Swiss-Prot record:
The keyword Ribosomal protein applies. NCBIfam families: PRK05327.1 (NF003717), rpsD_bact (TIGR01017). It comes from Streptococcus gordonii (strain Challis / ATCC 35105 / BCRC 15272 / CH1 / DL1 / V288). One of its GO terms (biological process) is translation. This is Small ribosomal subunit protein uS4. HAMAP family: Ribosomal_uS4_B. Belongs to the universal ribosomal protein uS4 family. Signal peptide: none annotated. SMART domains: Ribosomal_S4, S4. Gene3D superfamilies: Ribosomal Protein S4 Delta 41, Chain A, domain 1, RNA-binding S4 domain. Part of the 30S ribosomal subunit. Contacts protein S5. The interaction surface between S4 and S5 is involved in control of translational fidelity.
């Protein structure tokens, strides 16, 4: 299954989760597309709940199914910590996600585009791979030729707050992942235990 590139608002309503971080997708209609009102949502089976939670997490980070599953397999090989949280930490360390967390993009999808287009540097070197795994302390910055890209400047100006696990210099347009986040600092609406249950049955 490839990465979803369709209407994000419709997908957000289907999942019951804001994919942009603004919540605007659910402000008017917080029920599934094609459903006549919020009270007609059918009850999901155990498998359905697990699948829905997996999809929520996958679409939140905008990762294709194959890459998402491979990342889960990598998480199973980490000996310390809790599997579900370790999986989420691997997602958090993706370069496109860190660019989003720093406020250099308004959405993860936009952050992925900035990385793909070569606007982003890691420790002074251009990296155009959204899945690049960021290590705490690495400096994420905007390439000199891209410092005046309107979309980047608008994103920085629109960002009202940043997570405690990142630092950012708005004048230099650079920042870093200062530490790995705690569980209560990321995606409280996700029940990663259901995602683990889903893949434990599949692998």
């Amino acid at each position: 299954m490839s990465r979803y590139t369709g209407p994000s608002w419709k997908q957000a309503r289907r999942l019951g989760l804001s994919l942009t971080g603004t919540g605007k997708e659910l402000a008017r209609r917080n029920y599934v597309p094609g459903q006549h009102g919020p009270n007609n949502r059918s009850k999901l089976s155990e498998y359905g709940l697990q699948l829905a939670e997996k999809q929520k997490l996958r679409f939140t980070y905008g990762v294709g199914e194959k890459q998402f599953r491979n990342l889960f397999v990598q998480a199973t090989k980490i000996k310390e910590g809790i599997l579900g949280f370790n999986f989420m930490l691997l997602l958090e360390r993706r370069l496109d996600n860190v660019v989003y967390r720093l406020g250099l993009a308004t959405t993860r999808r936009q952050a992925r585009q900035f990385v793909n287009h070569g606007h982003i540097l890691v420790d002074g070197k251009r990296v155009d791979i959204p899945s690049y795994r960021v290590t705490p302390g690495q400096v994420i910055s905007v390439r000199e030729k891209s410092l005046k890209v309107p979309a980047i400047l608008e994103a920085v100006e629109a960002t009202l707050g940043r997570p405690a696990f990142v630092s950012f210099d708005a004048e230099k347009l650079e920042g870093s992942l200062t530490r790995l986040p705690e569980r209560d600092e990321i995606n409280p609406e996700i029940n990663e235990a259901l995602v683990v249950e889903f893949y434990n049955k599949m692998l």
